[in-house]
Amino acid sequence: MILTHPAFAARRAFTFLEVMIVVVILGVLAAIVIPQFGTATQDARASALKANLGGVRAAIAGYRANAVLAGSPPYPTLTELTTPNTVVQGDFPQNPYNGLATVQTVSFAQASSRAVVNATTFGWNYYVDNAATPPVAIFYANAADDAGANASGNPIRANEH
């Protein structure tokens, strides 16, 4: 004779239907939550891009102010821009869209249209002409990924900031 404890006799396993209902509920929750993480990642990259661009452009403006007072060419050359602690304090920031901290020179036409050139090799594009009247310097991201939207809801590319 096998005796069972009364507390164990009333127990039973989940049915297949109950397990499937739980799986469906988890699937619906995942479908709602996961796309929001994608948006958060895009927003974080766009914010990092704006911060990095602002930092480098502010450093270029600071260099320009000192150079004008010293009677030197107003904008840094590519070598001066990328030499640590000459224009930018510390290491050059990475482009958050391609992870590269390298800078290349581009033509005036490319800079004016914010062309993306060699995006797998360079994170940033820089055009400088100290001989122009007035002198010109254009610094922008070397990536065309979506980096937010304007007031009308139209996408803004990383190279348009």
For each feature predicted by the language model, list its residue ranges.
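Extracellular/periplasmic head regions of type IV pilus-like filament subunits
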Residues: 65-135
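N-terminal leader/signal peptides at the extreme start of proteins
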Residues: 1-14
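Alpha-helical hydrophobic helix detector
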Residues: 20-36
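Short, surface-exposed interaction loops/tails
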Residues: 115-161
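Conserved hydrophobic/amphipathic alpha-helical signal-anchor segments
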Residues: 31, 42-80
